[in-house]
Amino acid sequence: LNGGNVYRPTGKEKNLQAILNIHRHVIQNISPVTITAGKTLDIKIDNQSHILLITKGAIKVCRRIDSIVMGCGVSPMILGLVDAYADLYQLEENSDVFFIAETTCEYYPVPVKDFVEIADEKHLWRDISNILMYRIAFMTNRDRNLIGQDAYSQIKALLLELWSYPESSRFEINAQNFIQQRTGLSRSRIMQVLSELKSGDYIKILHGRLLELRNLPVSF
């Protein structure tokens, strides 16, 4: 989100080593769960809160009130850290978001109590803090790029965001849906912009999948 471009995470910013270190210590004697695109990932299992360690695929975070996509990410990642706070301190649970698999995903559910015990034993709280700080920075920068921007600027930002996904995940995602779910722009407006960009050889989309992206124009 610097200079009007989308904030694209790199390995250093995302603290991949922190995430992988947590995965390494926590994923032991746990069976993975695999779900297909469009399915909900439940952090509440058997009426017990869980942390979800995502090892494969892409996830989107949706606002419960209107299903607008608030954020997204690709593996490896960890879900449920914020919701775990309410569980740990017995606060009223009223999560404003829910998680949807954007592609086929694999994850390991870990009860919050067990996760906290492992975090204490293996001294993982610094890693957890780094992950949460990254998320705050990511969302702040992403909002700056989308809120109050014109339609083309929003579409450009999200095309760049989608392009930053691993190819295997990107090929499972419909570009038009990806943009509409995150902006609320009309389908016709999105398709108009995408059509113009394709005509100018800025992008290549086949069956809804973003295959190529070149330097996008500053304005439209």
Q: What does each model-found stretch correspond to?
A:
Residues 1-41, 78, 83-90:
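Cyclic nucleotide-binding regulatory module and flanking cytosolic helices
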Residues 28-29, 38-51, 66, 93-95:
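A short beta-loop-beta micro-motif enriched in histidine and acidic residues
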Residues 31, 40, 57-63, 106-107:
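Short beta-strand segments in beta-sandwich/barrel cores
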Residues 49-67, 74-77:
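Glycine- and acidic-residue-biased ligand/ion/polar-headgroup-sensing regions
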Residues 50, 58, 104-106, 209:
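Structural motif
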Residues 72-131:
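Cyclic-nucleotide recognition modules
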Residues 123-184:
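Polybasic "coupling" helices that flank or enter modular domains
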Residues 160-220:
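Phosphate-/nucleic-acid-contacting segments
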